[in-house]
UniProtKB/Swiss-Prot annotation:
Annotated EC: 3.6.1.27
Transmembrane stretches, start-end: 4-24, 44-64, 85-105, 113-133, 149-169, 188-208, 226-246, 255-275
Protein name: Undecaprenyl-diphosphatase
Predominant subcellular localization, coarse grouping: membrane
Other known facts: Bacitracin is thought to be involved in the inhibition of peptidoglycan synthesis by sequestering undecaprenyl diphosphate, thereby reducing the pool of lipid carrier available.
Gene symbol of the encoding locus: uppP
Key words, A-Z: Antibiotic resistance, Cell membrane, Cell shape, Cell wall biogenesis/degradation, Hydrolase, Membrane, Peptidoglycan synthesis, Transmembrane, Transmembrane helix
Enzyme type, top EC level: hydrolase
One Gene Ontology term of the molecular function aspect: undecaprenyl-diphosphatase activity
């Protein structure tokens, strides 16, 4: 049983690592894949598992962008250190809407909207939005092509888009990148800022889920600890690959391919539900 669950944890870790950073909804994919790959664990554990393996994905961002995010780096001059601190304060500002809106509604969303039809609907809706906005921006020059020039108010509005991602199937990265592009950032700046916003957001949600798990009187078994560790390690490795792929891809391409993917997957899910 443990061996089979480890294999399933590896698969879910791969799904998390790829889909967390691509704008296609990691939670949506985990819900869909998890409905097929049943581990035989309690619902409380699986709800917590789907969020806790995000620690691996978060670590990937920290590792890849450590120099850029480290204000204490001796390789940075005084101006660069100041810019790094400013970036962090903008990230904190951007996270506030999710704290105010997302955290209080998180449990309600999990209970009422963590369903395949909701995931499918959001996949389709945001897929259409990606295609429409990319077509609209085809001949436009981004107003903000450098992360250091991103205005404070723009950072806050991007954070408001992140708050929308509490609906399963939306995609945290998808909502923030879409919002950033809509406001006027380049794809590259929108993606990077989305990654950095993920650090406090995902750590906060994961801690919340772990706290809820233990508050309800649950404990980890030895096997469950192994499953969690495997999921996090795999998520970390795949996230490294996923982030590098995305940042290389958007240097020459737009997000429409992800929009079409979302629409096709959403239609397939809805079709499967009604067959």
């Amino acid at each position: 049983m443990l061996t089979l669950n480890v294999i399933k944890a590896i698969i879910l870790g791969i799904v998390e690592g790829f889909t967390e950073w691509l704008p296609i909804s990691s939670t949506g994919h985990l819900v869909l894949v998890g409905s097929v790959l049943k581990m035989g664990e309690s619902k409380a554990f699986m709800d917590m598992f789907n969020y806790v393996i995000q620690f691996g994905a978060i670590l990937a961002v920290v590792v890849l962008y450590f120099h850029k995010l480290n204000p204490f780096s001796p390789q940075k001059n005084q101006l660069e250190q100041k810019q790094t601190w400013t970036l962090w304060f903008k990230v904190i500002l951007a996270v506030i809407p999710s704290v105010i809106i997302g955290f209080p509604l998180n449990d309600w969303m999990d209970e009422h909207l963590m369903q395949n039809w909701v995931v499918a609907s959001m996949l389709i809706l945001y897929g259409i939005l990606f295609i429409v906005i990319e077509n609209r921006n085809k001949q436009r020059t981004p107003k903000f092509a450098d992360l250091n020039t991103l205005p404070w108010l723009t950072a806050f509005w991007i954070g408001c888009f992140q708050a929308l991602s509490i609906i399963p199937g939306t995609s945290r990265s998808g909502a923030t990148i879409l919002g950033a592009i809509l406001i006027g950032t380049s794809r590259f700046v929108g993606a990077e800022f989305s990654f950095f916003m993920a650090i406090p957001t995902m750590i906060g949600v994961s801690i919340l889920k772990i706290g809820k798990f233990f508050y309800q009187g649950n404990t980890f078994t030895g096997d469950q600890s192994i499953i969690l560790l495997v999921g996090m390690v795999v998520s970390f490795i795949i996230s490294i690959i996923s982030i590098k792929f995305l940042m290389g891809y958007i240097k020459k391409n737009d997000f429409k391919v992800f929009g079409w993917y979302r629409i096709i997957l959403g239609v397939l899910v809805l079709g499967a539900m009604f067959l």
